[in-house]
Amino acid sequence: MKLFKIEDYVKLENPTPGEMHRPEILLSKHNAKALGGMLGLLPAGCQVPYHYHKNRESIIIFISGEGIEIIEGEEFPVKAGDVLFIPAGEKHTTINRSNSDLRYLEFFTCPPVTADFFEVKEDQR
């Protein structure tokens, strides 16, 4: 069992100020076999590379700030309190166009986070 306290992740200081920080927070050491989890911390002006997952499904829980999620070329505004499901195969990215941090918790199948991550080149979008 692992308890995730949102206020702890909202208050967490970014160890790489001005840069994206995405540590894994749910690992096999927590007895997680089919799920993984990570904190996404996107400072103002940062963007996750446009990508997709062949097998992974994700639930993203936005916990502070606001941003844009682009899924298959369509923009969706997101903010604290929003929850997003992304099925396997959908190309997506998260962008922070605001002046403050955007933070989210992401829980996903097929861990670890790097195992099923395929960046989409500009000409493939």
Locations of the language-model features?
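Short, conserved beta-strand element in jelly-roll/cupin
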Residues: 41-43, 52-71, 107-110
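A short, N-terminal "cap"/entry segment at the start of jelly-roll beta-barrel domains
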Residues: 1-35, 117-125
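Short beta-strand His + acidic residue motifs that chelate non-heme Fe in jelly-roll/DSBH
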Residues: 50, 69-70, 86, 92-98
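A generic "binding-loop/recognition-motif" signal
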Residues: 55, 74, 90-91, 100
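A short hydrophobic beta-strand segment most commonly corresponding to one strand
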Residues: 39, 85, 99-116
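Short acidic-glycine-tyrosine-enriched beta hairpin
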Residues: 73-88
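A short beta-loop-beta micro-motif enriched in histidine and acidic residues
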Residues: 25-36, 46-59, 72, 80
